[in-house]
Curated annotation (Swiss-Prot):
Pfam family, any one: Spindle_Spc25
Taxonomic lineage of the native organism: Eukaryota, Fungi, Dikarya, Ascomycota, Saccharomycotina
Originating organism: Yarrowia lipolytica (strain CLIB 122 / E 150)
Protein name in the entry: Probable kinetochore protein SPC25
InterPro entries, sorted: Spc25, Spc25_C
Chain ranges passing through the membrane: none
Keywords annotated in UniProt: Cell cycle, Cell division, Centromere, Chromosome, Coiled coil, Kinetochore, Mitosis, Nucleus
Coiled coil location: 27-126
Amino acid sequence: MTTLPTLPPLPEDIVTGMEELKIVMSAALERQRSQLVQSRQDVNRVLKELEEESKGVSLEIESHMARQHDLRLQISELDKQIEDSKGTIVEYSRRRSELESKVEAAQRACDEGRQRLEEQQSLRRRQVQHVMEQSVRNVPELMYMEDLLGMKIEAVQDDQLRFVFVKLDPNDYAREFAFVLDMADVNYRVEQLEPTLDLSVVDRVVGKLNSSRNFPQFLKEIRQAFKDAIME
């Protein structure tokens, strides 16, 4: 039987070099992995800032927040890929870049929504100011309306009006039933109810106002809610 020749051992300097190369490559891979984890944390931080800035703006902005939630799910999937050593650094970087672009687009959409909201608020303030100026010129007419309808409107501060009803309580026609309407945001809010009403009733009436913008119907229903409370 023919005996195969034995290969000579590698020179010691080559063996040493290969070991050093393994160490260097391991360190480089660990640094890259740490950078990926840091990048993920940076993306999450940006998303968190977006979420904080977008609170209480409008339904349109909420839809963008839902989009951000979807992006978080995608980032979570990337996290699993990092932990399981799946995928490549190039692919992760590409997908991360795509997510950053989408986050920036969501931010721009939020900024645009916020700008439109500010414009609407500015317009509403001008409208309120016009009403107040007109009311000064029409004091006799207002006094007549107050006496006829048993309702008056008082300016509280910017973006807030106080509505006062009388002639509701058959035992005390002078008794006042009042609330403050806050118009600072896109959706109206009712505050400082005197006397207090059932919260579910108020939410229902205000919800209809915000969806229909039918202000006369709103006044009719909130007045009726006060009358119903007297009978309870």
